[in-house]
Amino acid sequence: MISMLRCISLFLSVILITGYFVTPVMSCNCKAPETALCARRCQQHG
């Protein structure tokens, strides 16, 4: 039971962290990148 709860909480935290990093990148404004991550992503895509 405890291991299952731990697994679920780990899964949820991974989803939250991924969402936190992916969402700003998806809506990046390459003309004026708000974050360093955006700037790097914009450079990769040309």
UniProtKB/Swiss-Prot annotation:
It is found in: Secreted. Keywords: Amidation, Calcium-activated potassium channel impairing toxin, Disulfide bond, Ion channel impairing toxin, Neurotoxin, Potassium channel impairing toxin, Secreted, Signal, Toxin. Expressed by the venom gland. The modification Histidine amide is found at residue 45. Disulfide bonds join 28-38, 30-42. GO terms for cellular component: extracellular region. Residues 1-27 form the signal peptide. Residues 40-41 are annotated as: Essential for toxin activity. Neurotoxin that blocks voltage-independent calcium-activated potassium channels (KCNN1=SK1, KCNN2=SK2, KCNN3=SK3). This is Apamin. It comes from Apis cerana cerana (Oriental honeybee).
